[in-house]
Amino acid sequence: MERRIHLMQLPREVLLGENLTGEVVSVAKRIGLTGKALVIYGPKTKEIAGRDVEDAIKSAYEVSSLTIRKGATMEEVERTIEKIKDEGIGWVIAVGGGSIIDVAKLSSFKTGVPFISFPTTASHDGIASANASIKDLGSKTSVKAVPPVAVIADVKVIKTAPYRYLAAGVGDTISNLTAVRDWQLAHRIKGEYYSEYAASLSLMSAKMVMRNADIIRLGNEESVRKVIKALISTGVAMSIAGSSRPASGAEHLFSHALDMLLDKPALHGEQTGLGTIIMAYLHGMKWERVRETLKRVGAPTNAYELGIDPEVIIEALTIAHTIRPERYTILGKDGLTREAAEKAAKITGVI
């Protein structure tokens, strides 16, 4: 008889509050992290919180640091791995947005060293998930790695990021609605594994931001808390599922297609938000509710607001199905025709 083993790796601690830089050491101690620490940040996030985190850790651990300048690329991942190995690093803490966290995630996975996520924005659900989005050879791919052993979300730090990032976090969370529909479709048509538990948690996160859209729009600390909670529980849903299925469907393929077609893509969550409006229409869902929520939080709902040529939107819709052919979605095996793509984008007001 075949043994069915399903591994769920989850963060052991999630800390949400204010002025948490001083808490890093106690979290590390509680989890039992030992050895030299490596703090990873970007040039901006070093100033926002990176240096403070580094100083806080110095009181109890030997510390090294690394500035990521090129975003989430394989080159930066290799550079981080090299530093971890050369300096005998015992644990890593990533202070930054999605790119910095993704670099830490893949580096720690490849070296077997635990990492803590210290997000400086609430713009996407990678802050607590096991999946890393890495740019390599021109295109972005989602790579399975490990989730952080802890997430330390300081609402005061996150609130300093431009409001646009918070609105993007809503876009990434609301995409769970169509992602779960795609997952259910793949389960019915392809017999793919489906977890009711993971799907429910993912949908709950999306519904939570929809219900609290007006509070989120205020852009205060309570707004940050609402979005961060939704993003973290989405990350946990992915860990429970053992894949990004609960939070990534055709709307994410559309966003990846835009990444490939544009020299300067918009924020990930802004693109997935737009994709969710269109995919909700294709699924026969109440797409107007998705658009309404995005409008209420001040997120873009059309190509014009994102500064994207309508032609690019149509092209992205027609090539989206080729990005992860093994991932069955509403786009099917053959994708959308140009006519169908244009019609869907026009009906939903995206173009």
Swiss-Prot record:
Listed GO biological process terms: glycerophospholipid metabolic process; phospholipid biosynthetic process
Pathway: Membrane lipid metabolism; glycerophospholipid metabolism
Keywords, in A-Z order: Cytoplasm, Lipid biosynthesis, Lipid metabolism, Metal-binding, NAD, NADP, Oxidoreductase, Phospholipid biosynthesis, Phospholipid metabolism, Zinc
InterPro entries: G1P_dehydrogenase_arc, G1PDH, Glycerol_DH
Binding site for substrate: D125, D172, H256
EC number annotated for this UniProt entry: 1.1.1.261
Residues binding NAD(+): G98, S99, I100, I101, D102, T120, T121, A122, S123, S129
Reactions this protein catalyses: sn-glycerol 1-phosphate + NAD(+) = dihydroxyacetone phosphate + NADH + H(+); sn-glycerol 1-phosphate + NADP(+) = dihydroxyacetone phosphate + NADPH + H(+)
Family annotation (CDD domains): Gro1PDH (cd08173)
Key word Zinc present: yes
One annotated Gene Ontology cellular component of this protein: cytoplasm
Record-level Gene Ontology MF annotations: glycerol-1-phosphate dehydrogenase (NAD+) activity; glycerol-1-phosphate dehydrogenase (NADP+) activity; metal ion binding
Domain of life, source organism: Archaea
Keyword field contains Lipoprotein: no
Binding, Zn(2+): D172, H252, H268
Listed cofactors: Zn(2+)
Entries under Pfam families matching the protein: Fe-ADH_2
UniProt subcellular location: Cytoplasm
Cofactor binding annotation: Binds 1 zinc ion per subunit.
HAMAP family in the cross-refs: G1P_dehydrogenase_A (MF_00497_A)
PANTHER family: GLYCEROL DEHYDROGENASE (PTHR43616), GLYCEROL DEHYDROGENASE 1 (PTHR43616:SF5)
Its biological purpose: Catalyzes the NAD(P)H-dependent reduction of dihydroxyacetonephosphate (DHAP or glycerone phosphate) to glycerol 1-phosphate (G1P). The G1P thus generated is used as the glycerophosphate backbone of phospholipids in the cellular membranes of Archaea.
Family to which this protein belongs: Belongs to the glycerol-1-phosphate dehydrogenase family.
Protein name (Swiss-Prot/TrEMBL): Glycerol-1-phosphate dehydrogenase [NAD(P)+]
Protein source organism: Thermococcus kodakarensis (strain ATCC BAA-918 / JCM 12380 / KOD1)
Gene designation per UniProt: egsA
